């Protein structure tokens, strides 16, 4: 099975749980044993790749700015690309530039995905019951790419992914283990660094640097 083989399942779930005028957002980056797999919550309409008019890749954070501050500050994108992203309006991203950005993500050996692939019109929280519909698909995704380390963002995603109650501020830099298809992966829970979580971005950066160097 390949990563793209999962997309049809995400598209079906989008119709059930997402905004019907928007498309599902999948994933992107290094698909072959990346150094880190970053697992966020779910996409919103701020991602310009979620529009029906978009013809290119449907990867996380296309057309946004703040998350790239995190990736720049942990050394995963170069300053030239970061400055270009910060200078661009969302509508200035096109399919070619999105491919270029993700080619750089791939070069740096990291992978970006969300637990929930159902795009919402805004950043409203999703109930656990919806995110859990995607859990087995995320496990399949991880089994395909086989990352060296997994970073999950925020209490809700960390709790669902690990199957135990997680409070990120209490487990900073702590390594958990998860077994997927008989292979064990190290997992770290990190503060969610976007939206209301922007106040914690410096703590997220600190923890990710620690995890990368461990």
Give the residues covered by each predicted segment.
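A hydrophobic alpha-helix/topogenic segment detector
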Residues: 16, 172-214
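A polyanion-binding, active-site-adjacent surface
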Residues: 2-149, 155-164, 168, 185-186, ...
